[in-house]
Amino acid sequence: MSGSLYRSPSAALYKSPSMSAFGGLPAAFGSMSVADLGSLTRLEDKIRLLQEDLESARELRNRIERERADLSVQLIALTDRLEDAEGTTDSQIESNRKREAELQKLRKLLEESQLENEDAMNILRKKHQDACLDYAEQIEQLQKKNSKIDRERQRLQHEVIELTATIDQLKKDKHLAEKAAERFEAQTVELSNKVEDLNRHVNDLAQQRQRLQAENNDLLKEIHDQKVQLDNLQHVKYQLAQQLEEARRRLEDAERERSQLQAQLHQVQLELDSVRTALDEESAARAEAEHKLALANTEITQWKSKFDAEVALHHEEVEDLRKKMLQKQAEYEEQIEIMLQKISQLEKAKSRLQSEVEVLIVDLEKAQNTIAILERAKEQLEKTVNELKVRIDELTVELEAAQREARAALAELQKLKNLYEKAVEQKEALARENKKLQDDLHEAKEALADANRKLHELDLENARLAGEIRELQTALKESEAARRDAENRAQRALAELQQLRIEMERRLQEKEEEMEALRKNMQFEIDRLTAALADAEARMKAEISRLKKKYQAEIAELEMTVDNLNRANIEAQKTIKKQSEQLKILQASLEDTQRQLQQTLDQYALAQRKVSALSAELEECKVALDNAIRARKQAEIDLEEANGRITDLVSVNNNLTAIKNKLETELSTAQADLDEATKELHAADERANRALADAARAVEQLHEEQEHSMKIDALRKSLEEQVKQLQVQFRKLKRRLLGGKRVIAKLETRIRDLETALDEETRRHKETQGALRKKDRRIKEVQMQVDEEHKMFVMAQDTADRLLEKLNIQKRQLGEAESLTMANLRVRRYQRELEDAEGRADQAESSLHLIRAKHRHQLLRAKMLQRQKFTFSKMSNRDN
């Protein structure tokens, strides 16, 4: 009975709190405060004190039981001795007295032990009541905490729901990250293709560079040749300029001489007019003189004799006239010689000018040839320059594109390096985390196996406890039956010993009342404890079912979380493998891109050097082109000057032809005059012959002048043809210039198209940069998500650790509960043994009462016998 007394508080202490704690397992130990731990320590201290009290009570009861057993043995022996010593003597009566004294001592000892037991029971009741109050308070606190734990559990359930939502979101983000990784792989493939295209483009640029270098060398050679030709042309130009200056000076001298000759010719014409008038006068005079000569001849014939003196006088006059005529003829001859000298000088100047004109024509032809060559070279140079410009523009565009791509590649490389470093760090962190996860997973699996094993053990323990509860119920029923039997026996013993107790009622009335009160209290306690036990059993069953359900739910949740963690771990391992493979691929592609970038950088440096060399060569070509353009302009200016000079020469030639015509007319008139003079002046035959010779020479000179004029006409015609050819070539040059302008316009349109394409490429580049920024942001978001996943994993790890700690605490509590159940079982066993001992004590008391009654009866009989003997002795003495 008293075992149930000691069972219910421990059950209330260790069953309900632990069960409530197990009910709120995911949250109770997660939110258990220091006060709860303090209360648990206080409860453990109280339990320890109660256990010590129980042990002391056990020791006392054991000692009492031993003493009772000894006393029962002694009583049995005494009863046997009393039965054997019933017909003994006074010595036996003395021994009976001694035995009664011993029995009194034993009764005192029994009473003292009963008092000690009652004191211990009162102390235990007080302690039990205090413990019950403490347990009630603690139960209330634990109920409050249980409500808090339920709220916390609900909150944790919400958090679990949120965590599942976040896990789903993380799965979605992971799927998106995988898609992004696939896009990154596609972009890496595109980048590798672009890098290959860049390599091919760089190879093409290298080939174009080699070709351009060869063309540049050829152009340098051509430019060198052109420079040499330009130097020669400049030298020829300088010589031509000098010759033209000399020709200009000569022309100016010739013009001055021509003006002088014109003035002299005018004077000669005036003189010829005067000579004509003089010749007319002389012819008239000659005619008159001939007439007079005829008259004179007639008169001479008539008057020869008469006028010999007059003839002499007239001969002197004729001589004077002849002298005068000879003087005039000499003057005329001198003037003609001067004219012939002037004509010879003019012929020399004409021949010199003709030779100069021929030289100029030859030089002009050479200049035209050189101009044609230079024009062809200029066209080639313009073509090459245009091609070089186009190539330079293309190269500059390609160079800018390559620079942009190189910068973009460098930026991509830097980003890839950063991403690679981050990925390496993430890989290392993920490897460490994976190792930790594997270890934690292994530990969690072991803990889960332990938890499953412990759960199985708990199920077995629950089954065992249920069996023990059933056994306790049966034991309780048996104890109740034994109590009823004991009560029945006690009633029968009371009925049998009612007569014997009449004498002991006064002494034992208080004890009986106390025992009755104690029995009532014990009955009340037993009823209360049975009710509490029933309630505790019901609560325990409900709690066990609830705990079982909760454990099953928690085990299912733990299994789900473990499965989720396993799946997450497997997915993380897969993602780690994928990321490691992607990292390897990215590392290989990064190395390839680094090599290609190094090659592109080397090629870029070579291209820069080539571009600098080409730019220098282009500058030289531009300088040469400018020089050629200036030379062309100078040649055009020289051509215009030559055309002007040719026109001047043509005008001079026309003037000379006019002068020649005038001279021919004048010579014809002079020849007519000379013919008339020869007709008129037979006397001046020598002068006439001389004049004829001079006229013949003049005619020859005239023929020569005619031939020279014919040559000049031919030269003029050839010069006109050359001028026409030059005009045709000039028109061709204009057309070519127009064609060049059209080509330049086409090139400008091409440049505009290229600029638009460049703008489009820059826009695309900006778009790609924006996409790369978006991808960087997405990578950062994925990194943040990975960090959050890592944090969630750390939190899950912490929760797993807390669960393991809770499982350990539960295990410890289960061990403590097992120890308490064992202690309760021991207490129950001790209580049963105590009850049995009490029953045996009651039986011993009843037997003792019987023995006392028998002993009293025997004493009375002995006294009566002694009295009878004494009376008999007195009577015998009296009789004696």
Curated annotation (Swiss-Prot):
<keyword id="KW-0175">Coiled coil</keyword>
<dbReference type="Pfam" id="PF01576">
    <property type="entry name" value="Myosin_tail_1"/>
</dbReference>
<feature type="region of interest" description="Nonhelical region">
    <location>
        <begin position="860"/>
        <end position="880"/>
    </location>
</feature>
<feature type="coiled-coil region">
    <location>
        <begin position="35"/>
        <end position="859"/>
    </location>
</feature>
<keyword id="KW-0963">Cytoplasm</keyword>
<dbReference type="InterPro" id="IPR014751">
    <property type="entry name" value="XRCC4-like_C"/>
</dbReference>
<dbReference type="InterPro" id="IPR002928">
    <property type="entry name" value="Myosin_tail"/>
</dbReference>
<dbReference type="GO" id="GO:0030016">
    <property type="term" value="C:myofibril"/>
</dbReference>
<keyword id="KW-0514">Muscle protein</keyword>
<feature type="region of interest" description="Nonhelical region">
    <location>
        <begin position="1"/>
        <end position="34"/>
    </location>
</feature>
<dbReference type="GO" id="GO:0005923">
    <property type="term" value="C:bicellular tight junction"/>
</dbReference>
<comment type="subunit">
    <text>Homodimer.</text>
</comment>
<protein>
    <recommendedName>
        <fullName>Paramyosin</fullName>
    </recommendedName>
</protein>
<keyword id="KW-0505">Motor protein</keyword>
<comment type="function">
    <text>Paramyosin is a major structural component of many thick filaments isolated from invertebrate muscles.</text>
</comment>
<keyword id="KW-0787">Thick filament</keyword>
<dbReference type="GO" id="GO:0016459">
    <property type="term" value="C:myosin complex"/>
</dbReference>
<keyword id="KW-0518">Myosin</keyword>
<dbReference type="GO" id="GO:0032982">
    <property type="term" value="C:myosin filament"/>
</dbReference>
<comment type="similarity">
    <text>Belongs to the paramyosin family.</text>
</comment>
